[in-house]
Amino acid sequence: MGTTAITNGLAARDSKTPIYYIHTSGTGILTYGDIDRFTYGELSLKVFDDWDGVAELTSLPDHAPHRNVDKLVLNAGNLDPALVKTAIVCPPCIYGPGRGPGNTVSMQIPGLAALTLRQGHGVQVGEGETHWSSVHVQDLSDVYLKLVEAAAAGGGDASWGAQGYYFAEAGDIVWGEVGQLVAQIAHKHGFIDSEKVVSYSADEVDAMHAHGSMLWGASSRSKAIRAGKVLGWVPTRPALEETVEDSLLIEAKRLELVPGHAKVAAGDA
């Protein structure tokens, strides 16, 4: 595992110069409650925050997604906090076009768009009441930039180590509402015959898309406080709903669909 090699290297350093390690986790780690209870598609009122609730975030159950890797990073930062300064950035649902040379699309919105096009109707898990927090990829990149700038300045005002856990979000979305929006846009462009949304069980959606029950049916609500307080971060890019149409059109092009085209077979995508 790459993180194991990195953290082992940090522990083995024989230097008195501080080193900074910024790790990317993900708020899939917060879905463990619905996964444990099998309450997919249901409303959860639990909201995690990275300021008053940071101790909870750094001691989540070991079986939570990503938790094993988070622990490696946290332990590395605890060995010698003066010399190894770690930060964990934990993004929620990421949307919007990337600016890098490689992959420029994320997972959840493009995945739901592609699934809608394949099935020929909108998709939701259970009652569709699951909330996820979300962030535009370019707002997210600002968090990394500000952390790197702080590290270059000797740590700056940023939090590191046990306190260095950063959410990055610009509000919540409700997956049933997003599924409806995707269906409306797909129908407007003639890719599907109606705006109908069909509810599937967790097992059914997993059979159609790997980890679909977690991606669109398990709650992940986060409140980004730390980045604003210590880094001055403020999200300014368009809301997720404003980017859904572009995401769907990209997926339609990838699937070689044209307006009015029948749905593609699930095995063709």
Role assignments for model-derived ranges:
Residues 88, 103-109, 133-141, 145, ...:
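Conserved loop-to-helix N-cap of the C-terminal "lid" that shapes the substrate pocket in Rossmann-like
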Residues 1-49:
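NAD(P)-cofactor binding segment of oxidoreductase domains
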